[in-house]
Amino acid sequence: RLHNLSGRTRRLSAIGYVEWVMGDLRAKSRMHVVTERDHQTGALLARNAYSTDFGGRMAFFDTDADGCGWTCDRLEFIGRNGSLHAPAALRRERLDSRLGAGLDPCAAIQVPLLLAAGDRSETTFRLGAGRNRKETLALARSRQGAHEAIDALDAVRIHWRNVLATVQVRTPDPALDALANGWLVYQTLGCRYLARSGYYQSGGAFGFRDQLQDALALVHARPDLTREHLLLCAAHQFTEGDVMHWWHPPQGRGVRTRCSDDYLWLPQGACRYLEVTGDASVLDEVVGYIEGRAVTPEEEGYYDMPTPSTQRGTLYAHCVLALERGCRLLGERGLPLMGSGDWNDGMNRVGDQQRGESVWLGFFLHDTLRRFIGLANAHGDAPRAEWCQQQAESLRQNLEQHAWDGAWYRRAWFDNGAPLGSSQNQECRIDSISQSWSVLSGVAAPERATQALDSLYTHLVRKDAQLIQLLDPPFDQTTEDPGYIRGYVPGVRENGGQYTHAAVWAAMAFAQQGDAVRAWELAGMINPLNHALDPEAVQTYRVEPYVLAADVYAVSPHVGRGGWTWYTGSAGWMYRLLVESLLGIRREGDRLSLAPCLPDHWPSFELSYRFGRSFYEFVVTRTAQGQATLHVDGMLQPDLTVLLRDDGHHYRVALDLCAPPG
């Protein structure tokens, strides 16, 4: 939209511009992209007949304006040795209408505008694609007219307002409200789950553990999607119990690896979905397995398209198979094998000879087994529940016997038996996720839990830079080879920078311990809005302050600089930290309660929770002397829970917590 406020007539051009990829990498595909123009609609078209999976598809770019100039030649548009900062086309009145094969393909449409003083103008550009030429042109025709664009934009706004309305908060911290009420769910659902793409990585693949974690963060806003994704992931499990590390739809090509944690996210996810929704029917859904050749000892993994297996099983059976595999692949200390990396893919050579063991994975497996006990009992499988109890207890004993280093928990053991994340190490003496998950899993004895988090806070929280390191000191000169993590500059990304995923887990662990001061301190460090409060901070952080960044650098001269924004799973975990760990949402089926971990200076906050067509409006105060009280529409609820009813009503909930000390 343009509004001429200059006080005189202006002659302008509005130019819409796209660069065609039509494949995975533009450098590979551009020689195969052929462009043309449909004379009836004026749409510029592009196709890549050599695309392995999408050879028949065609894309279009067009506008409703008349008298337009256009070109499909990027060289013509930007000029020789030119750039998009100052395209050569802007120095000419008309584009040269070049199209066909053998060009550096693009689509540029130049709309001439003549605006008298006070005039307004609106130009709409459309970008789309169809399965073939006929469908593409039909789509282009059906979307002609400015009203189509306006209606589509309105529909998008209505959709997102509906999704984001599930949980809304009003707290004394406006930076928290901005993230919790919109940006984090939008980042998780829009970028991570639907697009699976970002400026730092435009991949499009489903990562088994990656999008499962995203879907679990969406269980309040989109439980249907969480359910659907559990079944999708189960359909990418091999008959041996391992899974595809990632795959590209729609064909399903991807990688099979010896990564040791992927498959355990399936039972972990099933447990969370049932804990929150109470929907046990998903466990009886029947899903097929896949088959493929085994990963050889000489490989970390291989890329291929698996074949569907004749074997099928319920989601419950898929989860059990994953747990059995996890409990079978143990090392000499009775802890899970590291394989070609656990959650930290960069530690891909710690245990690639199938002898190295992962302490973090021991905590994670214990947590998953512990959660599965209740699920198995509810499913009527008491023997499996007992088996989970025995396996979890064995893991707990082995972790407490072998993993404690004296002041914190170790991270792993190399294939040769050397420890990692130990005071014996010159590099990576302490790793964050072993400390946080020792608490989150319930393994650590109380005194060790406190000491482990104290060590994390002392050694990894950088108050000067407002960041939380993943590990310290970074890998640099060590004789042991941990893997490709050492390829990062010390202090960057996983190699000693802030890896925000792990930073959030640290804050969650402090909240679980009831340490509100440190939990909120760390949450404030992670919140990107707090890294852009003044021009100096903006110049330090240098990335978008409204979405989570996967990394914050911890090495001079880039200390405090963010990296890898948007496409990071830390967004979903940050959402869970804010609305669950800190503001205290606890939903168990049709029961909802709040158990917040609040700063002492907060007198109150408000929270709205949507259940179906109903809304529950919480007002949380802190004036109670003695026991907390909860009223729903004035009626006392002795168990401090709210019964959720999908009846279209607005319920008023008053929760009065005990007054803070002092």
Regions found by a protein language model. Give the residues of each.
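Polysaccharide-binding surfaces and accessory modules of carbohydrate-active proteins
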Residues: 1-92, 134-166, 293-301
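Short Pro-Gly-centered flexible turn/kink motifs
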Residues: 10, 113-131, 365-368
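Catalytic cores of carbohydrate-active enzymes
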Residues: 17, 28, 32, 244-245, ...
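Trp/Gly-enriched beta-strand surface patches
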Residues: 33-117, 173, 177-180, 184, ...
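Low-complexity, Ser/Thr/Pro/Gly-enriched N-terminal "stalk/linker" regions
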Residues: 154-201, 225-228, 232, 325, ...
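Active-site acid/base region of carbohydrate-active enzymes
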Residues: 170-182, 233-234, 238, 264-265, ...
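Aromatic-rich carbohydrate-recognition surfaces in CAZymes
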Residues: 218-334, 359-362, 366, 449, ...
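Non-catalytic C-terminal accessory modules of carbohydrate-active enzymes
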Residues: 458-463, 476, 488-493, 508-662
